Regions:
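Non-catalytic helical tethers at domain boundaries
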Residues: 1-139
Length: 139
């Protein structure tokens, strides 16, 4: 069995893979702070926009490399953050339930990135808690 990284290197240009991993790392590194600050009404608007952009970019880049689990997870997170950023109510904040869920998503994405970089054969299984998408996304 061939590892994920080796498989990507065979199917895609090496520069493309390196760019993907570099950008994925940079975007993922900023997620936790952006997510936690969704609880602050002064940061909510800018952070929900930035999170939406990051999840969109991860999704798009992962589609190109046919990394389906990453595409699916980032697409769900993009949809949720799309709902967040479209709420223009003054003083609105994200619910604790949503913040906890987004932190799980960020951990899962970091795990996927680690799996690729460590040349694992498969991407890890999805944390089952992620399946329970929060009903209440606003506080």
């Amino acid at each position: 069995m061939m590892g994920l990284l080796k498989e990507l290197e065979i199917n895609y240009d090496l520069d493309t893979i390196e760019d993907y991993l570099t950008h994925f790392n940079i975007m993922n590194a900023s997620l936790d702070k952006l997510i936690v600050n969704l609880s602050r009404d002064d940061k909510f608007q800018s952070n929900s926009l930035e999170l939406n952009r990051i999840f969109h970019n991860i999704k798009t880049a992962s589609q190109y490399l046919e990394l389906s689990p990453i595409v699916k997870l980032s697409a769900i997170a993009e949809d949720i953050t799309d709902r967040l950023k479209s709420n223009r109510t003054t003083g609105v904040k994200a619910s604790n339930e949503l913040i906890d869920w987004l932190l799980l998503v960020a951990d899962q994405l970091q795990g996927y990135l680690d799996d690729i970089e460590n040349d694992e054969i498969y991407l890890r299984i999805l944390n089952p808690k992620i399946i329970a998408i929060p009903n209440e996304i606003f506080n």
